[in-house]
Amino acid sequence: MADKNKRPPRIDLKSPDGKFGRLMQIGGTALVVLFAVVLVFYIVTSHDKKGGGATAGAIRVTSSKLVAQPGTSNPKAVVSLYEDFLCPACGNFERGFGPTVSRLIDIGAIAADYTMVDILSSPRNDNYSARAAAAAYCVADESIDAFRRFHTALFSKDIQPSEVGKTFPDNAKLIELAREAGVVGKVPDCINSGKYLSKVDGLAAAANIHATPTVKINGTEYEWSTPEALVAKIKEIVGDIPGMDTAATAPAA
């Protein structure tokens, strides 16, 4: 008969003194570190190209060279743009300043926050402002790079309709332009379902925007005049970083 007092030795998993305990601690630490590395990699790669946005409905566009405030990841200069895709002044602004803003983004001088608002929609224009703005958010969900191309295309002379015109791009055309910008994915369903129509409807009021284009630099409204003046203003904030001297780019044709 076995002696009830003779029990098999127990392995104390909590004890750091035993060899097995030390192995468990080392293994657990390694797993935690590995998980952290994988998580950081996922966050960085997901944020890099997938849709993104900033706050209050803005689509944030940056580059990996972004000049940040010391000790933080916050940009030194944020240019906020509030635009309506049907607005003729917005078209003029983008064709005149768009290449320079894009260049400032690429050299890391600014983060650009694009808020596409609906001010000019009406049944007469098939609610184009709202549909185009909502489509831009659909594209941004899939790719920020594609959003940049889509945004530029919709303000081009060949595509932007006249505010008093009789024909306006339908959803099929917006989907085609999104495809040409480099995305398909969920964009067609997003556009056709009107996923972001209610969102864009209230963006102008939420930001207290009454006219487009409105441009702000670090939250203060900026009276734009020339691309050179814009570059000079940004240079005051971030300094003379590489590429700044050639950032004022010729207007788009």
Where are the language model's segments positioned?
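C-terminal cap of thioredoxin/glutaredoxin-like
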Residues: 2-48, 175-253
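A general structural signal for short secondary-structure boundary/capping elements
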Residues: 58-60, 127, 158-160, 183-184
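Short low-complexity stretches enriched in small and charged residues
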Residues: 39-41, 66-72, 110, 168-176
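Structural alpha/beta surface segment adjacent to cysteine/selenocysteine redox centers
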Residues: 75, 83-85, 91-167, 171
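Extracytoplasmic low-complexity, Pro/Thr/Ser/Ala/Gly-rich segments
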Residues: 46-108, 114-116, 124, 242-253
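Functionally engaged cysteine thiol sites
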Residues: 54-55, 138, 190, 223
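Short acidic/polar alpha-helix capping motifs at helix-coil junctions
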Residues: 5, 62-68, 139-140, 166-169
